[in-house]
Amino acid sequence: MNNRAHTFLWGIRQFRTSIPRSRALRTYSLVFCKPEVIHSKRNPRNHLLNGFDEGLQPSVRYLFQDIFISKSVAGCTQTRGIIHAAGFKLDRILCPRRLSFDAKHSFVSDGTSDHDLMKTNFHHTSTEDVLTKKMRPTPVNYKKLAQECNSLSDVLDTFSKAPTFPGSNYFLAMWIIAKRISEDKRRFEKQLMFSHPAFNQLCEQMMREAKIMRYDHLLFSLNAIVKLGVPQNSLMVQTLLRTIQERISECDERCLSILSTALVTMEPCMNVNALRAGLRILVDQQVWNINDIFTLQTVMRCIGKDMKALKELGRFSVLNSRHMFEVLAAMDHRSVVLLNECSKIVIDNIHGCPFKVLISILQSCRDLRYQNEDLFKSIADYVATTFDIWKLKHVIFFLLSFETLGFRPPGLMDKLLEKVVQEPGSLTVKNIVSVLHVYSSLNHVHNVQNREFLEALASALTGCLHQISSESLLNAVHSFCMMNYFPLAPINQLIKENIIHELLTSGDTEKNIHKLHVLNTCLKLDESTYKCIHIPLPQLPLTASHPNEKLAEVLSRLLEGDGCFSRNVQLPHNYHIDFEIRMDTNRTQVFSFSEGDASSATNMQRVAVLCVPKSAYCLNSNHLRGLMAMKIRHLNVMGFHVILIHNWELKKLKMEDAVTFVRKKIYSDEALATTDESV
């Protein structure tokens, strides 16, 4: 027995030295496709001699195929092998795993003597080559698979015919196909995917492969699976999340970017939160070694680091700077330093910037509450300069974005105004409502063609009355009223009983009621032909008003007591003013309220003092926005002289300076000159 074992081991050593390892050890990727298993000469005492190569580390188990070595037990050779029906050849060992082999293709078969072992021809491969062609399917490339298949079900059909490792390729191919089809078709294809008989099999294969798959493939798979709409609480997604946690030490710079992208779209849960915590620790260690700017931005979007980004500003390309706005907005991180620097780069390279990028920048500025007049002006001037190359809907989209930022671009608005006057028929219902909203909100009035502009819009709206919704009609008429223009046909359509009833009972009723009250007020106070019309509406709730306390104290000192002004005055038509003062018509003398009541109406001027915020004006200008301009117009109709006090300016002044500031606002220049002479 000892001699036979010695001879056997000697033969193994001869095998190692007689041929190169590359000829003897054929490596294959692991195939999880439930292969056909064939047992030869099954015997419970059969077992393999593993780890026969002394050069292999004992902790690593490699995959070999078509190599088998039997062990002699009690004088007889016993074997047990497995044939794998599928497998494909690679140039390197992909994954460590133990694998049994088939005696049919072993180097030593039953009945072979120890002497014959030394004579075995290790270079004979013709039988192996024939079997290999039958056993190995063509390797699956997800890009090629996505090109060959037209639907998600086609990919699953391909998988069901010949499953191969790794399963991630099938999910990646399905996600590529899903991205290139329409939203409606994508929804239908996903339903077919979930009901496909091979889908569960693919999910099971993914879970089995998770621990041995390459880490970046695992992350790509998670991202594709989530994007395909697989429920986050499903066993497969949670298994992948848990496996990614366990293998997070394998995460390199590229994997950081993939993992951050996947986590951004996922809802919080125990495994997601744990993975984010682990990623945060990993980023703390590696963030200073990240070289790729896009990877840095993706990690910032998930984690929120901007210290590293500040050091890398000198390396930011134009593309990096444009993308940074979206990254900061996605993580709701308002880094003014980063935004300012990126704005400079965008301004310097504004020409040729695509529409989607410019809109994304403006929307990100809105989300971050970042106001950079130079950036907005640069974009507006670029669009105005290249006005003819833009579609009408693109220009309107720019103006809607500027309106949400409170920025009024006069040049661009005049360009569009002239276009509307020339071609009113090119406007759709949506275009008309949007244009009216922007111009009324920003209170933009053309010096020459304003009347023609409003008439063109009214004419275009009249032609669409048969297809416009009640809410859109209300929005359009509300905008016309703010601009002190009253088109007959749209108003007649709006005040019909059935339209009013629909507005009061459906949609955003609170907003509809408010706009209908504005319509009532404009019809009563402005010069219109509808003064006799009154739309019965529910009463609006009174809004709680808290007049500026500092301004109240300033008025008390300036007017020597509280008897000469009134606070929080409620007026008809749902208007209120912060303070009311009664003066003579020349605004040189202030009356107490008892004197004002006794004075003749011709000698008394009611003064409305309004403390207004910055939001009442367009960005960094003294140009009033639409609602405040309409309120002042209506207060003037009701007999008030309106004085606006900027609360942000008053807040910065000391009390003595504030009194002087308000005095100049209230009294006329004549009264101030008289006061200065007497002093």
Curated annotation (Swiss-Prot):
The modification Phosphoserine is found at S113, S126. Pfam families: FAST_1, RAP. The keyword GTP-binding does not apply. Monomer. Found in a complex with GRSF1, DDX28, DHX30 and FASTKD5. Associates with the 16S mitochondrial rRNA (16S mt-rRNA). Forms a regulatory protein-RNA complex, consisting of RCC1L, NGRN, RPUSD3, RPUSD4, TRUB2, FASTKD2 and 16S mt-rRNA. The lineage of its organism: Eukaryota, Metazoa, Chordata, Craniata, Vertebrata. GO terms for molecular function: RNA binding; rRNA binding. It comes from the Eukaryota. InterPro entries: FAST_kinase, FAST_Leu-rich, RAP. Plays an important role in assembly of the mitochondrial large ribosomal subunit. As a component of a functional protein-RNA module, consisting of RCC1L, NGRN, RPUSD3, RPUSD4, TRUB2, FASTKD2 and 16S mitochondrial ribosomal RNA (16S mt-rRNA), controls 16S mt-rRNA abundance and is required for intra-mitochondrial translation. May play a role in mitochondrial apoptosis. This is FAST kinase domain-containing protein 2, mitochondrial. GO terms for cellular component: mitochondrial matrix; mitochondrial nucleoid; mitochondrion; ribonucleoprotein granule. The keyword tRNA-binding does not apply.
